[in-house]
Regions:
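S-adenosylmethionine
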Residues: 1-464
């Protein structure tokens, strides 16, 4: 982004926000970032929805692709380091900002995220923040404060960073407490530390992982996934995309479909299937797959993904609770809707858009879905339940409660089911991963290549 155009003369205080955005490249991106940060923090709006390239926020859609990428980078840094940024700001203020200066707080967070965490000129972050303040009637009177505060932080960046919070301070207090309660202080600290880094990209490949690791410039993981730290350019330009030789899927997300046993030639249902990564795995394992999802649009995406891979599956757009097939399945996979708290590395808005009440409601829904899933399987058939939540209410506690269902017999997962990642199997026979698994020590200390999504899986058999 070219941020070097001279600022308007002091006497020119009449241009609208829109005119300023035209006059000063980079301004509209910063204004958009502050606006979207407010939507996440104040209204619990999903960042994915706000930055969707088809249906996102109008202010975001009005930007050029390069500025959209900048907005996403700013928001990622702002949310991953929210507590650290807040502390850095508050320590350098003589008095707290007024409670109603909400727009100002978002503007400052966006600017400090650039100064501390992005490879952008500090002076651009400062100048554009001041200009954005002047362009907004709510913030105009604080323009001098914005200028002084940000210049002070940019001059003493290293000192400011050294005094910021520990990683657990970058998520809401309830979220931090729930993770500490579930995993203990040491494991929780490792999880929070991994939240600070964008995740690498994992691929599920159809053939030789070592070969594809070489072709894609990555490494083969113990389970056969291929990991690449970053991809320059579009995924669609990578070797093997057009040929359907691989699909993107976090290593943790690839594990539940591998717990089904021998499903070659068997009828298997993927009950919450879109976007289709697990569906593709089931087809790859030789199953006759029926993929369900409530959303026809999401199923359309799934069918497109399978078509690229050269795979086929029956698709059914329906609410799972209404699904009553004429013939029962040999096995079902229920990757249930959840709080997604295991995906904070790739979705840093999750701690701010989810609440404890959401987790309770989702756990209740999961219990109902799992109970119904049990009715869709032949006696002796396998049911795998999974989700990408870190919270025991949606995982271990859910599985223990499900075991009380007279149709569900626990079928413990063993180390043989998870070759190479045996440490993820718990003493109760569940699969539990966290972002702290596959730690940096396994990658020469590099956190950018480490970690995995938080996932839970439990396996059952249908009682006769």
């Amino acid at each position: 982004v070219n941020d070097k155009k001279p600022a308007p003369k002091r006497g020119n205080n009449k241009p609208s926000v829109q005119n300023n955005a035209v006059e000063r490249p980079g301004l509209s991106a910063r204004q958009c970032a502050a606006r979207l940060l407010g939507a996440v923090i104040e209204k619990n709006t999903s960042l994915d929805g706000l930055t969707d390239n088809s249906h996102g926020h109008p202010q975001y859609l009005a930007l050029e692709p390069r500025d959209r990428a900048l907005v996403r980078a700013i928001l990622g840094a702002s949310l991953r380091n929210r507590g650290a940024i807040e502390r850095a700001i508050s320590k350098r203020l003589d008095r707290p900002l007024p409670e109603n200066a909400v727009a100002l707080k978002h503007l400052l967070h966006v600017a400090v995220a650039q100064i501390f965490y992005l490879n952008l000129p500090d002076h651009s972050a400062v100048d554009l923040a001041v200009e954005a303040a002047n362009a907004d009637p709510r913030n105009r009177k604080y323009a001098g404060l914005v200028n002084a505060l940000l210049r002070r932080l940019s001059r003493n960046k290293e000192r400011a960073l050294a005094h910021t919070l520990l990683p657990e301070g970058n998520v809401p207090e309830w979220f931090a407490k729930s993770i500490v309660d579930a995993y203990g202080a040491e494991k929780a600290a490792a999880i929070f530390a991994m939240h600070a880094y964008e995740p690498p990209i994992d691929f599920t490949v159809k053939s030789d992982p070592e070969l594809w690791a070489e072709k894609l410039g990555g490494i083969a993981l113990p389970n056969g996934s291929v990991r690449v730290q970053t991809v320059e350019g579009a995924l669609t330009d990578l070797p093997g995309f057009a040929e359907g030789d691989w699909w993107v899927q976090d290593v943790a997300a690839s594990l539940p479909a591998r717990l089904m046993g021998d499903i070659n030639g068997k009828r298997v249902a993927d009950l919450c299937a879109a976007p289709g990564g697990k569906t593709a795995q089931l087809v790859q394992q030789g199953a006759d797959v029926t993929a369900l999802d409530m959303s026809e649009n999401r199923l359309k995406r799934l069918r497109g993904n399978l078509e690229r891979l050269g795979y086929e599956a029956k698709t059914v757009a329906t609410n799972l609770m209404d699904f009553a097939p004429e013939e029962l399945f040999d096995a079902v996979l229920l990757d249930a809707p959840c709080s997604s708290t295991g995906t904070v590395r790739r979705h840093p808005d999750v701690p701010w858009t989810k609440t404890p009440q959401d987790i309770t409601k989702l756990a209740d829904l999961q219990g109902k879905l799992l109970a119904h899933a049990a009715t869709l399987v032949k006696p002796g058939g396998v049911i795998v339940f999974s989700n990408c939540s870190l919270h025991p209410l949606e995982g271990e506690e859910m599985a223990r409660k499900a075991a009380e269902n007279p149709l569900l017999e626990p079928f413990p997962i063993t180390v043989d089911d998870c070759a190479g990642l045996e440490g993820l199997i718990t003493s109760e026979g569940y699969l539990r991963s966290t972002p702290a698994d596959l730690p940096p020590e396994r990658f020469n200390g590099d956190p950018h290549r480490a970690g995995m999504d938080g996932f839970f899986a439990a396996r059952f058999k249908r009682r006769a």
